[in-house]
Amino acid sequence: MVQYAVTLKGGDWTVFRDGEPIEHGMSRSAAIQMAKGLAFEAEEHGDTVELLIQGYYGEMSRRLSGGAED
């Protein structure tokens, strides 16, 4: 399983892969677009993907590959 996350860190939106930052200083929409693209590529290679996206008020949405959502 691979995990991608978009969170607000130090005032910047950051994209993480498996807990490690891979890109920062982005707008929220650009970070989400990047994370979704990376998640799609991972799914294409047969990986199970967890995508976590932080909202503006700190709430987290979670999506697992296959369209499951909490």
Model regions: which residues?
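Short, solvent-exposed secondary-structure boundary motifs
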Residues: 1, 30, 42, 69-70
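Short aromatic-glycine-(Arg/Gly/Cys) micro-motifs in beta-strand/loop hairpins
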Residues: 2-21
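Generic hydrophobic secondary-structure signal
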Residues: 6, 15, 32-34, 51-53
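Compositionally biased, intrinsically disordered low-complexity regions
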Residues: 12-15, 28, 57
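Short, surface-exposed beta-strand-loop junctions and turns on beta-sheet-rich folds
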Residues: 20-24, 31, 68
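Short capping micro-motif at the N-terminus of alpha-helices
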Residues: 24-25, 63
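A short, charged, amphipathic alpha-helix used as a generic interaction element across diverse proteins
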Residues: 26-48
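Short, mixed-charge low-complexity intrinsically disordered segments
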Residues: 44-70
